[in-house]
Structures are given as C-alpha cells and as structure tokens.
C-alpha cells in the first residue's frame, strides 16, 4: 500500500505563501474596481480615492473590513463621508473611521 501523505517541504511552504499573496492581490484588484464603480460620482471619488491610496498595504483582515463596508448602501456612506450625519457607533469599524477622517481631510474640513 502506497503512502499518500508527504512531509511538508520548504518549497511547499513558500508555494502556500505565494498562493496567499496571489489571493490578496486578487482581492485588492476587485476592491479597487468596486470602490471606483459605486454608481455615484461622489462615492466613486471618496471611496475610490481612499481604496486606491490604501489597498496595497491593507492586511487580509482590513480587506475583509473594507469589503464589508462596500456592501453598505451608498446613501449612508455618502452621508457619513461628507459629514452630513455622524457615524453610528455600531457601524464605526476602525477602517470606516479611517475613511471618514480621510474624507474630511480630502474635503478640506
């Protein structure tokens, strides 16, 4: 009977690392596309600008947080990013706080 199990070698570890990096790169590309194609000019500029400036340094956890933010409705995001409404505490993830602050700076506020 042949053994179907093989020991992990350094090359398999680096290969797994390469796959993980490829996965992060693909997520970053999708995130950039989604952030720049929201449907309204204002959100494309604010959200797209933030993502373009920050996505390449985001961790996997930060990418997940940003992906979840992009699931939120544009009217809510726009109100928070333009400072028309305060950011509700239950929605205030570290990433969304960064976005609100970035938006405030970009708007010169």
Curated annotation (Swiss-Prot):
Regions of compositional bias (Low complexity) in chain numbering: 7-17
GO cellular component, one term: cytoplasm
Cystine pairs: none
GO BP annotation list: tricarboxylic acid cycle
Protein location: Cytoplasm
Region (Disordered) residue spans: 1-22
Gene3D superfamilies cross-referenced by the UniProt entry: Flavinator of succinate dehydrogenase
Keywords: Chaperone, Cytoplasm
Family under the similarity heading: Belongs to the SdhE FAD assembly factor family.
Name of the protein this chain belongs to: FAD assembly factor SdhE
Organism: Acetobacter pasteurianus (strain NBRC 105184 / IFO 3283-01)
